[in-house]
Amino acid sequence: MKKACMLALCSMLLPHAYETARQRLIGWPQQEVEEGLIPEGLILKKQGLETAVDADAMMVGETSGTASTQPDNSSTRVIRTGRQASNAEGPGREYEPVMSMGIPIIGYLGGSKLTLLANQTNTQMLSVLVETNQGHMIMIDGGTEGDSAHLVESLLARGGHVDTWLITHPHSDHVGALMDILKHPEYGITIGNIYYSFAYPSWYQENEAYRADLVLDLLAAFQTLPAQTLHGDIFKGQEIMVDNVKITVMNQPYLYTHNAINNSSVVYLLEMNGKKAIFLGDMGEEAGKQLIADNPPEKLKCDIVQMAHHGQDGVGFEVYRILQPEICLWGAPSWLWNNDSGSGMGSGNWKTIETRKWMAQLGVPYHLCIKDGDQIIQ
C-alpha cells in the first residue's frame, strides 16, 4: 500500500519525467542490469522534489524537498547521487551512476548551449550544434544527407547563419548533410567559415578508394563558397574565437594506412564559460595513442567528450582515462548502442558494450545518445 501511494504521488507530481523514466527502465534488458551497464538509481529533480527511481524494484519515492504541481521546464535537470568508482583501473573519483534519459542538462554551460542532434535515419551519425552566449552558431560535422532536413530546420529556427563549421573528417555520416546544404542554397542556410584539414586526394584513393569520390564531391561543393569562407589549412594549436567560445585544434590529421580516414579525424576542443568539450570524430586506436603522446594530459582533460567512432572501435580506454569526462555524447542509434545485429542485445560484432563498460569503470555519470532524440546541455 505504501509503495502504491508513493508511486501515485510521484506520477502526479512528475508526470512527464516519471513516465519517461518508467518507460526507459522497463525497456532495459535484464542482461544490462546484470552486467552493471544500468545505473542503480535514476535521480530527477523538479522544483525541489528529488525522486529516486530504483531500476530493479521500479519503486519511486520522495527523498527530500518540497513538492510542487506547477510545471517548470527550466528547473528540470539531472542531479548527482554520488558513488565511488569500483574498478581499480578507473580514476577512483566520486561519480554519479546517472543517465540523463533524454532530460536536458540545465545550468551547466553558463549561457552557452550544446545540442546533440538526433539521427533521422537508422544509421550512425554525428551532428552537434553549439550556440555561444551571444547566440552565434558553431556546427561540428552535421550528419548524413538523410539528416539534412532536421539540421536545416534546427538552423533556420536560430536564424539560419552558421558562423563556424568544423569538420572532423570526410565520411558521409559526418559531412553528408553539409554537402546537401551546400548544393541547395535555396534552403536559406549561410556559413561564415568552414574549418577542416584533409590529406591529398590521392591519399584517399590509395587507402580507402571506395570513399575517395566523396572527398572530391565535398571539395567540389566547397567551390560554391567564397574563398575567404574556406580554411583548409588549420594546424595543431590553432585557436579560433567565436564570441565566448574558444576552439583549439588539437592535431594535424594522422595519416595511418589502417582505418585510414577515421584515424585522420581532426580533434577540436571547445572551451566555454569554464567548461571544456572535446570532439574526437571517428578517431581510431592508433591515432588516439598519437593524440595523447602529442598533448599533455592537462590539455586534454575535459568535461564533455564526443565518443570516438560513435562509441565503438574508436580510441582506446587510456584516452578516455586521460580525458576524465563528466558527460559523454554518443552518436549511436539504438541497434549500435545495444550491439544488436537483429537477434537482440549483444548479438552484433560492434564494441559499444565494451566502451560502455569502460565509462562505467571511469565513473562517468551522464550519457546523452542520439537514439533518445535531440540532447541538450546548456
Whereabouts are the PLM-identified features?
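Classical Sec-dependent N-terminal signal peptides that target proteins to the secretory pathway
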Residues: 3-19
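Long, low-complexity repeat tracts used as extracellular stalks/passenger repeats
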Residues: 34-35, 42-61
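Core dinuclear metal-dependent hydrolase active-site scaffold
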Residues: 58, 65, 71-160, 230-299, ...
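Binuclear metal-ion centers of metallo-dependent hydrolases, dominated by the metallo-beta-lactamase
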Residues: 90-92, 97, 193-195, 199-262, ...
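Active-site-proximal beta-strand/loop segments in catalytic clefts of secreted hydrolases
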Residues: 119-120, 140-143, 167-171, 197-199, ...
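Active-site environment of divalent metal-dependent phosphoester hydrolases
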Residues: 123-124, 145-147, 170-176, 201-204, ...
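Active-site metal-binding motif and surrounding structural segment of the metallo-beta-lactamase
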Residues: 135-136, 145-196, 295-312, 324-329
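Metal-dependent catalytic neighborhoods of phosphoester/phosphodiester hydrolases
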Residues: 175-185, 205-213, 317-320
